[in-house]
Amino acid sequence: MNKSEMGQGVYTGLSMIVADELDFPWDRVIVKPAPARDVYIDKKMGSQLTGGSTSVRNMYEFLRLLGASMKEMILESASREWKVPKEKLQARMGYVSYANKKASYGELWEKALKLPIPTQVRLKEPSEFIYIGKGVPRIDTKEKVEGKAIFGIDVRLKDMVYAVVERPPYFGAKVKSVDDSQARQIKDLLDVFTISSGVAVCAKTVEGALKGREKLKVEWTKSPLEGFDDERLSQYYLDMLKKKGVVARKDGNPALVLENTKRKISAVYLLPYLYHATMEPMACIVDVKEDRCTVYAPVQAQTWTLQTAKSITGLPEDKIEVYTTYLGGGFGRKSNVEFVKEALEISKKLKKTVKLIYTREDDVKSGWYRPMNATHLEGALDEKGRVVALYHKIAVPAVFEWAGRPSRVDRAAVEGIENMFYEIPH
C-alpha cells in the first residue's frame, strides 16, 4: 500500500476498490506498507505522500483498473492452461472455475505474471459492486483491538539505543555552547553531541536519555523570532490582508454585486498557529551503516523521507529502506520528516541503531504548526437569504514554498475555497 494508515481507514478503503474489481474474498485481504520507491508514487501528487484527504480521489480509477487487469490476466492464464475460451470461465471470490475445473487465483498467478498487461479491461457497473459503497470490517481493527498493531513508537530492534534532543526555546536559534559535564555522569548515558536542530543525548535507556537532557546547560544564539508574540503576529497578518494578492478563482463580478446589495455580511477572522496534537508524538528508528540505511517511521511522506536519508547518508536510493508503520494520527504533521532527519544524523554519528523519541512536551514545543492566517469574508444575500456573491481573501504562509514547489497561487492555502461545492454566481 503506497498510502499511510493513520486512523482514516485508507488501508480498508483502497483495498475495497482492488478487491471489488478482482472479485476477491474480503477476509483474505492482507495489506503491507509499500517501500519508498518511485513505482509507488501517487502520480497526481508527484510524490509518495498521504495528505489532503486525497487517497481515494487520486487512486480510485487506477486501483479499479489494477484489480480488473489482474482478474483479466488470471482468466487468461486459466484459459491457456485449460484450453478453454476465456469467455466461458468464471472468476469469483478468489477462484476461477469452468465445468468440473477449479483453481485459486494464487495457483494461476505465477503464469499470469508472465502475460502482457491488458490495454483495455471492462470495469464493473455500480450495480455489480460487492464492496464499493457497502460496509466491510476494517482491515486494521482486529490487530489494534488486540494491541498487536505496530506504531512508530512500538518498534524495537536488537541492540538499539535511545535518543532525545534538546531543541532551542524559539525558532531560528542555534547552539552557541554546551556544558554536558553533569549529563555525562548519568547512568546508561552514551554520548552527547550537537546536531543541526540542537543537542542530541543518547543512552542505553529512555530514562537515561531524559535524565541526561535535564542536566544539560545549553546557551543559544539570538534569533529574529525571539521577540515575536501574539499581538505582533496578529497585526502582521492583518496588515498583510490589506495588501494586493493573487487571484485563485473569480466567477462573475462579486465586487459589483457586493457594492449594490442591500444585505451584506462582512467579517475578519484570525486563526492562530495550531498544534496538530497527534495521539502518537514523533518517534522513529534509524540504522545507518556504511553501505546501507534502514528507517522505521510513522510518516506520511515516504518520498521526502527517502530523499532526506539519501542527503544525510550519501547512499544511493537502492541502499535505503523505509518501512512505514501505523501512524497514531497524522493530520499533515507527519508529512514533515525533520524528526527522521534528526535520527539519521544521530545514528550516523553514533554508529548505532537509534530510536529517537519526542515526549509530548517536545512535540508541543518543537512541532510544525498549522499556519496562522487572517481571512476577510464578505457575502451578499438576496431577498430569500441565499448567498449570491462571495469575496474571500486570505493571508497565510505559503506551504508549497518550503516543500520545494513554489507557485504563483499556493493551492494548499485555498483548498476548500477555490474548489468549493456551493453554487454562488459571483
Q: Where are these predicted regions, by residue range?
A:
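Structural alpha/beta core scaffold segments of enzyme domains
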Residues: 1-426
